[in-house]
Every structure is written in structure tokens, then in C-alpha cells.
Amino acid sequence: MSTLLFDKIVFGPIHSRRLGVSLGMNLLPTDGKVCSFDCIYCECGFNKDRKAQRRMPTREEVSESLRERLTQMQADGVTPDVITFAGNGEPTLHPDFEYIISDTIVTRDALCPKAKIAVLSNATQLHKESVCRALNRVDDNILKIDSVLDSRIRQIDRPHASGFGFAQLLEQLKRFDGNLMIQTMFLKGDVDGQSVNN
């Protein structure tokens, strides 16, 4: 499986069919993957093969990188439609995630006020109040559900937390009172000799 890792904090912009001109944000190390899932389809590769050795960027490094890139884009006459947190794994694992979202809102409001802020998350950190507060502040809170069957979640997403399952996830999703989008990867095929069809 070919893999893709982002080598910067801010990457792009890329043209997304769904989001438009998207400026990517990677809050994770640039040399590997940090994730609470080990999805069979992950573009970043499998966790064991892509283990990060470097540290996560600091809140200050993220803020400075975003401000520099948006300033350069302004000079080039390019405006992003969205600032998208994705990157080399699960962005909500960054210990300063809530503060980084706050900083991003301030920077966005100053330099590109029409741009939305989106977070692509696997929803494993919703038990943390700080993560929920931050996700409730972004424009596009995009959370993942690949299956409602725990057996399929274990097969497709391969969560690190043995107790992670759909019932718990559903209760946590209800707390957003509709302020979310669900993202699903539909699969059909064989993985390690087992049929996968969600």
C-alpha cells in the first residue's frame, strides 16, 4: 500500500471536491503517523510501519506557520475556502488542540474571514471535554463512522482502545446536537483473508 505523509504543519492548498480550496493543517509529527485507529485504508499507512520519532509541533509553531502561509496566499491572490485539520493521523490527539483551534479562529478572522474551519476526526477523543468544546467552535465538524457494528469497527478501523464501540460513540455524538457531519468509507473486498463489506 502506498502511503502519504505531510512534511509540513501547513500544506496545500489543494482542490477538494467536497470542501473547495482547502489549506491543510497537520498537528502531528512530519516523520510518521500518530493515530488512535489503524484503519486498513489509511493513506498514511499502518501505525507499526509509520511510527513517528519526532515531537508534535507546538501551539506557537502551528499559529506562526498558519499566519505565514495565509499571508503568502494573500500576496499571491489566493483565498482558501476552508482551513482543514487532518494530517498524519488524528488531529484531536494534539494536547493543545483546543487552544490551536482558538488561535486558528483568530488568525482566520484576521486574514481570511470568509474561510471555514474544518476538522476531520475519527471521533475517538470525544470523551475529552476540551476536544468537544473545540469541535463545537469549528464550521465543519466532520466525524467518522465506518460501521455501526463493533465487529466491523474492529476489522476496518482497528481502534487502539479495546472498549471503543458504536454505542459509546453514538452517545458522544449526541452531545453535538446536530453540529456535525458524518464521514464514512464504504469498503467491499478481502483483507488478510477476511471479507470486508460495511
Question: Residue locations for each model-derived region?
Answer:
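Auxiliary Fe-S-binding modules of radical SAM enzymes
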Residues: 1-18, 64-67, 71, 194-198
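Canonical Radical SAM [4Fe-4S] cluster-binding loop centered on the CxxxCxxC motif
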Residues: 18-61
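Structural motif
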Residues: 20-22, 39, 80, 140, ...
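Short glycine-centered, acidic/aromatic-flanked micro-motifs in structured strand/loop junctions
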Residues: 27, 85-87, 184-186
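Short Fe-S-cluster ligation motifs
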Residues: 64-86
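Conserved AdoMet/S-adenosylmethionine-binding subsite of the radical SAM
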Residues: 93-198
